[in-house]
Regions:
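Long, contiguous binding/interaction regions
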Residues: 1-79
Length: 79
């Protein structure tokens, strides 16, 4: 199956959601090229950037599951 490159940008407004995001990313680790998390303490949010190489439907499914979490926003850009 053909794969696509994508960058997923995640804004987490609640620390309670971080564990769920990490679990979802761990479950899909085979598709992750790299990730970076930045805690922004002044605003009490976390910024996460994830680079993926996966089938487009898999990337969309991961993005959808993360986006359905409470206090989480996600945007995905495809190369």
């Amino acid at each position: 199956m053909e794969t696509r490159l994508a960058v997923m940008s995640i804004i987490v407004r609640s620390k309670e959601s971080v564990n769920a995001i990490n679990e979802l990313l761990h479950e899909n680790g085979e598709y992750i090229i790299g990730r970076m998390g930045i805690p922004y303490r002044e605003r009490n949010i976390n910024l996460i950037s994830v680079a993926l190489d996966a089938p487009q439907d898999k990337i969309s499914a991961i993005s959808g599951k993360i986006g359905n979490l409470e206090n989480v926003e996600v945007k995905t850009a495809f190369a």
